[in-house]
C-alpha cells in the first residue's frame, strides 16, 4: 500500500500546505574559476560554478593524503617512526624533518594538515605504503571510490605536474568524506598545538574569522592559484565550500557559507519516532497498528520547493507485531526527486488474541441463560 502525503503539511507540521516558504537569499558573485557549496549531511549541491572542470588543486591535495593515511592506520597515530633522508628536503612549505630523528605519526599527520608540510606528506605516504608511487595509487583508487570522476593525483602534496588535478565538485566530495572520518575531522578543526617541540599553526584563517568554521585545507601554487576547501556548522547543519583559483577566497567562502545557511536551511522532514501511518491489525484486541520513522530525515530546502512523502505499508497486518520491527518504508521527495528515506517500524507491540472472539459470544449467550456455567464449562467455551 502506498500513500502519498504532503510532508510539510501532514507529517512535520512545520507550515500548512505543500510548499516551504522562507526568506529568499541571492547567491553571491565569486571570483573563483570554479566553486561549489555542498550540504555535508545529504551531499546536495547548493551552489556551483564551473564545478566539473579539472584544475590544479595545490595543497588541498593533502586532504586525500590525510584520508588515505587515516583509513590505513585505523586512526592510530601513536606509533613512532624514524625519519628517512629521502623524506626530507621537499620544496615548498615544510615541517623541516631531520633525517634520523624520531617523531610520532600524530606529529606528521598534524604537520601535514596545519602548516601543510610537503615533507610530512611524503613521510606519511612512505610509512603507510612503503613508497610514494604505491600511496598515490591508493589515492587515485580512493578518489574513484568517492565518485571523483574528474580527478587524478600524481603526488601526495600537490606539487605535481599537469597530470595532477581535480574539479571543485570532486573536492567537495572529498571534503565530505574527510568530515566523516573522525581522525581527519579533528585535525582540520585544530587551530594550533605543540607536538614534540614543534609549534603547529593552521593556515586556515577561517577557523578564527568565521563563526562555526570546522576547518579543512588551504593551498597555493603559481599554477593553481589560491585553492581552499572549508567547512562550517550552524544549527546542526554542515556546509562544505570549495574554490579553485580564487584570489578572494576568504571573502568568497564567507559569502557562500552565509548564503547556504540562509537560503537552504536544514529542514526536518520526519523525526525518529514520529508516526507516519497506521494499518488494520487482525487477530488482536487492538484494531490498528501504528508505524513510525526509525531515523530522523532532514534535507536543506530552498524557498518554494515542494515536499511529499510516499509511505509503503501493508494493507493489513496479522498479530502479533513487535515494537521496533520493520513495518515498511517512507520515501521523501523534493520536486519529484527522492532525497531521503527511512524504514518504518511498529510503534508498539500487540499480541495475538488468546481467546477466540466467537467463544466470547458463546459465553455471553450462556451467561444469559437460567443457569450460570461452571468454571470448566466457561473455559471450554473460550478455547480457540
Model-derived regions: residue spans:
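Sec-dependent N-terminal signal peptides of Gram-positive bacterial secreted proteins and lipoproteins
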Residues: 2-24
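Sterically constrained small-residue positions within well-ordered secondary structures
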Residues: 15, 26-28, 232, 320-321
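Active-site-adjacent loops and short helices of periplasmic peptidoglycan-processing enzymes
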Residues: 22-169, 173-182
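Domain-terminus/edge residues, biased toward the C-terminal soluble/receptor-binding domains
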Residues: 148-152, 160-165, 169-384
Amino acid at each position: 500500500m502506498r500513500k502519498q502525503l504532503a510532508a510539510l503539511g501532514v507529517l512535520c507540521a512545520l507550515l500548512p500546505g505543500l510548499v516551504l516558504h522562507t526568506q529568499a537569499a541571492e547567491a553571491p558573485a565569486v571570483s573563483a574559476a570554479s566553486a561549489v557549496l555542498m550540504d555535508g549531511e545529504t551531499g546536495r549541491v547548493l551552489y556551483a560554478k564551473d564545478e566539473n572542470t579539472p584544475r590544479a588543486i595545490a595543497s588541498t591535495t593533502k586532504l586525500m593524503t590525510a584520508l588515505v593515511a587515516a583509513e590505513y592506520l585505523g586512526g592510530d597515530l601513536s606509533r613512532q617512526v624514524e625519519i628517512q633522508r629521502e623524506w626530507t628536503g621537499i620544496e615548498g612549505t615544510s615541517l623541516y624533518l631531520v633525517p634520523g630523528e624520531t617523531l610520532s605519526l600524530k606529529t606528521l599527520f598534524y604537520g601535514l594538515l596545519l602548516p601543510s608540510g610537503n615533507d610530512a606528506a611524503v613521510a606519511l605516504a612512505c610509512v603507510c605504503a612503503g613508497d610514494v608511487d604505491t600511496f598515490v595509487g591508493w589515492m587515485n583508487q580512493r578518489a574513484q571510490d568517492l565518485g571523483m570522476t574528474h580527478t587524478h593525483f600524481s603526488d601526495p602534496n600537490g606539487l605535481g605536474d599537469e597530470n595532477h588535478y581535480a574539479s571543485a565538485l570532486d573536492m567537495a566530495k572529498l571534503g565530505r568524506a574527510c568530515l566523516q572520518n573522525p581522525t581527519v575531522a579533528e585535525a582540520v578543526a585544530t587551530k594550533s598545538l605543540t607536538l614534540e617541540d614543534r609549534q603547529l599553526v593552521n593556515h586556515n584563517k577561517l577557523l578564527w574569522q568565521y563563526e562555526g568554521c570546522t576547518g579543512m585545507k588551504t593551498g597555493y601554487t603559481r599554477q593553481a592559484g589560491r585553492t581552499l576547501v572549508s567547512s562550517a556548522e550552524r544549527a546542526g547543519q554542515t556546509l562544505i565550500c570549495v574554490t579553485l583559483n580564487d584570489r578572494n577566497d576568504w571573502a568568497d567562502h564567507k559569502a557562500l557559507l552565509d548564503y547556504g545557511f540562509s537560503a537552504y536551511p536544514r529542514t526536518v522532514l520526519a523525526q525518529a519516532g514520529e508516526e507516519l501511518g497506521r494499518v488494520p491489525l487482525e487477530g488482536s484486541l487492538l484494531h490498528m497498528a501504528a508505524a513510525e520513522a526509525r531515523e530522523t530525515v532532514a534535507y536543506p530546502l530552498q524557498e518554494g520547493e515542494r515536499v511529499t512523502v510516499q509511505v509503503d505499508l501493508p494493507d493489513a497486518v496479522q498479530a502479533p507485531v513487535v515494537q521496533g520491527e520493520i513495518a515498511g518504508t517512507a520515501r521523501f521527495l523534493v520536486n519529484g526527486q527522492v532525497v531521503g528515506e527511512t524504514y518504518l517500524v511498529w510503534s508498539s507491540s500487540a499480541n495475538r488474541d488468546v481467546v477466540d472472539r466467537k467463544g466470547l459470544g458463546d459465553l455471553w449467550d450462556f451467561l444469559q441463560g437460567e443457569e450460570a456455567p461452571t468454571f470448566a464449562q466457561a473455559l471450554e467455551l473460550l478455547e480457540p
